[in-house]
Amino acid sequence: MRIDIITIFPDYFTPLDLSLIGKARRSGLIDVRLHDLRRWTYDRHHTVDDTPYGGGPGMVMKPEPWGEALDEITADADAGTPRLILPTPSGLPFTQQDAVRLAKEPWLIFACGRYEGIDARVAVDAAQRMPVEELSIGDYVLNGGEVATLVIVEAISRLLPGVLGNVESITQDSFAPGTMDNLVEGPVYTKPPVWRGHEVPPILLSGHHAAIDRWRRDEALRKTARNRPDLIRRLDPESLDKRDREVLAEVGLQETSEPVAD
């Protein structure tokens, strides 16, 4: 996968040299290319922003540098057509399903906005040549798109073949399609079996794989109900077995996933 990142702070992305993502880059599994937006500015101060039309606080990123940057980066016709990602708090919520979908793309470009955002005409113009998506990592505002881009790139990259040492871990992640769809992962434990008087649940030491799978499913349901009841309401009732319904009833939820009346 090729990933181009356009930003006024290329150094923000040094974490992509670390851990499994850095190893994947060095082995050629991921081709990450950083671009300083100011390279496409020509005044003495390398200006990338200006005052907003219509008035109001803050500054807006100018369209000219963005247009030239995207033109030059996408000029490599042999690389195919990229998908442009605009991280913004006004975008669609980024989910694990989006990570799975985007991990199948051969080429992604991330445009990291700053200030009040990027002139809206940039996305309109780019959409004439490539798919464009606005994505949000949460209902809060950051100083720019760099942090969101790091989040999305890591979520996508870890799904690529060869990046993780154990591919089974992906299927057991929170929100993973299949048995973990719309569920968060339950508690995890490692050695020693007793630490400061706290014991690992005996079932995990039993070697009974079917029982362990059932325990993990139960704990995922309990933790999701406690921390993310909104996800429980999204569960397909047809996907719930008898034990699932019993667990939901234990934590105060009916089979229909609606809260039980007091």
Curated annotation (Swiss-Prot):
It is found in: Cytoplasm. It is an enzyme of class 2 (transferase). Its main location: cytoplasm. GO terms for molecular function: tRNA (guanine(37)-N1)-methyltransferase activity. Its EC number is 2.1.1.228. S-adenosyl-L-methionine binds at residues 113, 137-142. Keywords: Cytoplasm, Methyltransferase, S-adenosyl-L-methionine, Transferase, tRNA processing. It catalyses: guanosine(37) in tRNA + S-adenosyl-L-methionine = N(1)-methylguanosine(37) in tRNA + S-adenosyl-L-homocysteine + H(+). One of its GO terms (biological process) is tRNA N1-guanine methylation. Gene3D superfamilies: 3.40.1280.10, tRNA(m1g37)methyltransferase, domain 2 (1.10.1270.20). GO terms for cellular component: cytosol. InterPro entries: Alpha/beta_knot_MTases, tRNA_m1G_MeTrfase_C_sf, tRNA_m1G_MeTrfase_TrmD, tRNA_m1G_MTases_N, tRNA_MeTrfase_TRMD/TRM10. SUPFAM superfamilies: alpha/beta knot. Belongs to the RNA methyltransferase TrmD family. Homodimer. Specifically methylates guanosine-37 in various tRNAs. PANTHER family: TRNA (GUANINE-N(1)-)-METHYLTRANSFERASE (PTHR46417:SF1). This is tRNA (guanine-N(1)-)-methyltransferase.
